[in-house]
Amino acid sequence: MKYIDKLETKDLVLAKAKMEDLESIYNNYWCSEVTAKYMLWSPQKNLDEARDRLVRTINYQKENLAFLIYDKKTKEAIGQVAFVEIENGIYEDRGLGLGEKFVGNGYGKQVLNCMLEYIFNSLNAQKVYCSCHTDNIPSARMQMSCGLKYSHSIMVTRDKDLLTYKSDNYVITREDWSRR
């Protein structure tokens, strides 16, 4: 399936990654230990590692519902978001993350609402799932503020460090989305 290449919110642009994004995505997001704490990836140690990751990201985004997140004012890449269709009409997040200095100002909510609008209205989804580490209270609050409801928790083991943690899963149906 061919997905849209760009979406916009009040303060942000969600668009496909480009090699020119290397320094901003590295400095604002990929090198951060704080940001990576609740994510499945490890921080990049240098620009060479980030360059390799950016090439993989560009290739992944060509065929998937995935974007870098850009600040409209500075044009810098500050995070990323991805969703996959796990069953016909059912989507699940593969991550929504922002650099630590961009958290707490409503950007996550803008991104999630924008993605939900696209998934429900353009892709005709019936249901969308999102998840977060149980200890990531700001992420859980953001998901609920966008209309998602707690569904269930599961134990997950991260590949990067074999840490086993509890993941809380949230869901929103097409019907719930349309009533917002």
Where are these regions (language model features)?
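Acyl-donor (CoA/ACP) binding surface of acyl/acetyltransferases
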Residues: 1-24, 28-32, 68-180
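Hydrophobic residues in alpha-helical segments
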Residues: 29, 39, 58-61
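Secondary-structure boundary/capping residues
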Residues: 34, 44, 63-66, 128
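Conserved GNAT-fold acetyl-CoA-binding loop/helix
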Residues: 34-56
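A short helix-loop-beta-strand connector motif used in the catalytic cores of GNAT acetyltransferases and
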Residues: 55-68
